[in-house]
């Protein structure tokens, strides 16, 4: 990546992350086609034309997994612009695509993954622009990063971000689900990523004939939840067991 890459300076790029799991039939990448489709959708929204087809990128990801001798792992595909011009007016820049793969057993500490994590309400608001909420656009992750660092500095494991209306949005990089009286709730996607793991959990819940609803969820509702968990490609499914609320710390079963 050139030091004057437009993406490095202005965040003009998109990315996707997928996980591969070892099955009885060999390694399999979870929801690969869905992730690649979302990558292309994100690129089109910010005016980037990827010169490869979705099938070609799917094959490239599978090949990368194999060439790295991985049975399980995480793959990151990134689309970034070249260095032919700098400044916001730069046009006709080259479009580059790279795929990386590595072992990443746990996004969190293994003990945290096993026992659950603590979260704290962030002072950083999520997604003012609905364009960004449905895709992984590089330049939109600054507030997420700041929210996570703020949470870690305060002794929590993760941040809980609210939207501009004060409703729960998501974690710094995860969707959230809340269980109350055997009913599952998750925020609408107006101000959060419509995660592919999120979609899978919702489909499984429906297949199991569990009640699940998308709705605006206020912070107080979380404090009174019976259960809560995060979902995401990196984090997979992770229990929330403690809310670091200064005036009312809350343990969740």
What are the residue ranges of the model-derived segments?
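Short, internal active-site loops enriched in acidic
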Residues: 80-85
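Helix-start/capping segments and mature chain N-termini
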Residues: 1-63, 67, 86-240, 244, ...
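Short secondary-structure junction motifs
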Residues: 72-74, 156-157
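Hydrophobic alpha-helical segments, chiefly the membrane-spanning helices
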Residues: 252-253
